[in-house]
Each structure stands twice: as structure tokens, then as C-alpha cells.
Design a protein with these regions (language model features):
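Intracellular helix-loop hinge segments at the cytoplasmic ends of transmembrane helices
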Residues: 71, 75, 168-177
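Extracytoplasmic gate region of multi-pass secondary transporters
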Residues: 46-115
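Transmembrane alpha-helical segments of major facilitator superfamily
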Residues: 95-107, 134, 159, 194, ...
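A late C-terminal transmembrane helix in Major Facilitator Superfamily
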Residues: 175-214, 221
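Helix-to-loop junctions at the C-terminal end of transmembrane segments
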Residues: 110-123, 209
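Juxtamembrane intracellular "pre-TM" segments in multi-pass secondary transporters
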Residues: 2-55, 83
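Multi-pass alpha-helical transporter architecture, strongest
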Residues: 217-238
């Protein structure tokens, strides 16, 4: 004989028609968050206990250079006598705007070359070379700016090439220096350095331009890139 209660399926195991209560998991949320924070702290300690720390500093310096250069470069170019506004067909043309656009366009090629370069040479070597180029270009800019239009346009194109070409190189460096189990976290910290702390570059550039000249600004940027190159040298020895 079949049990009637089992046959009609109307009663739950507690002897009533009510469904079994589902446990309240609201208390699990704080526990889960706390566990996640502990895991993140542990992973961060493991990450910064490696050569990634040195790479992190190098990326931070690159971020300062990147933002310090590109934030105010349009204004610096607009004030350059070699790129003074001209009248064309009754319209005022700003050559500085076209030069800056060309700089950004050349940066596309720089990113491609930078990425390809890491397939041919060690990423640290490429990183060092690009930092050195950025330093030389920044220190040379005030002098080249006074020479004439063609040299000024040329150095702007070189700046665009190298400043954007550095991006894929540092990404490869980060991937090589971070342990496999914290690769994702390493990119989070890297972009914090690049676009978070590195954003101080815009503030530094603004302060320098307010209290000094554009020549001083490019000297500061040259020093920043030089420090980046020294950091990569330390990374190669790590």
C-alpha cells in the first residue's frame, strides 16, 4: 500500500503543506566580503613581494610623463611662434591643432611598433630604450621649438610615436613580472599607477607652467623619464 502523503506530494517533510523555509543567507554577505578582502590583501602582498614592485614604479613614472606631456602640449604648441595662426581663405587656421592631431595619429603606429618590438627583443630592453628616447625628446623640445616649423613638427611626431609606443611594452613587462595566479590583480594595480597616481602629472605640469615656463616643464618631464629609465635598469637587475 502506498503512503497517501507521499502519493499526493502535498505535504513537505515537516508535516505541513508549507514549503521548507529557506535559510537566511544575509549573514553570509559580510563574511564573504571580509574573506574577499583578506584574499585580496594576501594576493597583493604576494604580488608586491616580487619584481612587479619595480615595474609598478616604472609604470607610475610613465603615467606622470604621459599626462604631464599630453595635457598641456596643445597649449604649448599654440604659443609656439613657428605654429602661429594663419589666415586662409578668410578663416583663421591653427596649425598647432593639426600638429597635435598628427602626433596622436602617429601614436597608432607607435603602439603597433612597440607591441611588435617585444616579440623581437626582451621587453625590459625595449622599455629602457623607449624611456631613454622620451627623456631625450623632452629635454630637446625647448631647443628644437626655437629652430623652426619643420624640426618642431618632427619632434612632436617622435613624441607621439614613443609616448604611445611605450604602452604595449609596459603591459608585456607587467605580465612577465607578475605571478600567474595574480595576473588580473597586477593589471588593476598597473592601471591605478598609470591613470590614477599618474594623473598627478597633469597637476605637476599645471603647477610648473603657472610658476615657470614650458622649458622648465619639459626639463621636469625629461627627468621623470630619466628616473623611469633608471627604474627599468633596476628591474633588469632584479
Amino acid at each position: 500500500e502506498t503512503d497517501g502523503t507521499a502519493a499526493d506530494g502535498g505535504e513537505s517533510g515537516n508535516g505541513t503543506d508549507e514549503p521548507d523555509p529557506v535559510g537566511d543567507d544575509s549573514d553570509e554577505t559580510p563574511v564573504s566580503i571580509a574573506a574577499e578582502l583578506r584574499q585580496m590583501a594576501t594576493s597583493s602582498r604576494a604580488l608586491f613581494g616580487t619584481a612587479f614592485t619595480v615595474a609598478f614604479v616604472a609604470v607610475l613614472l610613465y603615467g606622470v610623463y604621459y599626462r604631464g606631456l599630453l595635457t598641456f602640449l596643445p597649449d604649448v604648441l599654440a604659443e609656439s611662434p613657428a605654429l602661429a595662426p594663419v589666415e586662409l581663405l578668410g578663416q583663421t587656421v591653427q596649425p598647432s591643432q593639426y600638429v597635435y592631431t598628427a602626433l596622436l595619429t602617429v601614436g597608432i603606429g607607435g603602439q603597433y611598433v612597440g607591441g611588435r618590438l617585444t616579440d623581437r627583443v626582451p621587453s625590459r630592453t625595449a622599455f629602457l630604450g623607449f624611456f631613454a628616447a622620451l627623456s631625450v625628446l623632452a629635454l630637446s623640445f625647448p631647443l628644437v621649438r626655437e629652430v623652426g616649423t619643420v624640426p618642431l613638427v618632427g619632434i612632436c611626431l617622435l613624441l607621439g610615436f614613443f609616448v604611445y609606443g611605450t604602452a604595449p611594452i609596459y603591459q608585456v613587462v607587467v605580465s612577465e613580472e607578475a605571478p600567474d595566479e595574480v595576473q588580473g590583480l597586477s593589471y588593476g594595480f598597473t592601471y591605478l599607477a598609470m591613470f590614477g597616481v599618474g594623473a598627478l602629472g597633469a597637476s605637476i605640469a599645471g603647477f610648473v607652467l603657472t610658476n615657470a615656463t614650458s622649458a622648465v616643464l619639459f626639463s621636469v618631464l625629461g627627468v621623470v623619464a630619466g628616473l623611469g629609465a633608471l627604474t627599468v635598469v633596476a628591474l633588469r637587475r632584479a
